[in-house]
Amino acid sequence: YNTPLGSTEIKLPGFTVDTKAPTSVKIKANKSGIKTRSTSSKNTYSKRIKKSVKFTFSANYGTSGKFMTQYKFVPRGKKASKYKWKTANSVTYKKRNKKVRLYVRYIDKSGNITTKKTNGFYVTKK
């Protein structure tokens, strides 16, 4: 049946199966101009950041709760699949003059996954 929040739940004797991926996912940056986007959106790399940028990750994990949040920075012109995921709830990026985009995946305790990315950006000295 569907819960009031729209989650699909399968009731079996003694437990519930959560089949809904995390929702309301956000990649928050402490600098303006970096947005959370779908992984299918076009990559752009025009956003310049001074010194460094800190990202924090949040989501609604639903019935089963949070298992982990993972991220990876992918350089311009490179495929995301070539880079390994790292586990954290936040990360600071400081590498200068390298155009990158950030991918984040949100995983609940039932193994449901939602993946998002940011628009591309690069960090400068001043």
Regions found by a protein language model. Name each.
Residues 1-126:
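Low-complexity, disordered linker/stalk regions enriched in Pro/Thr/Ser/Gly
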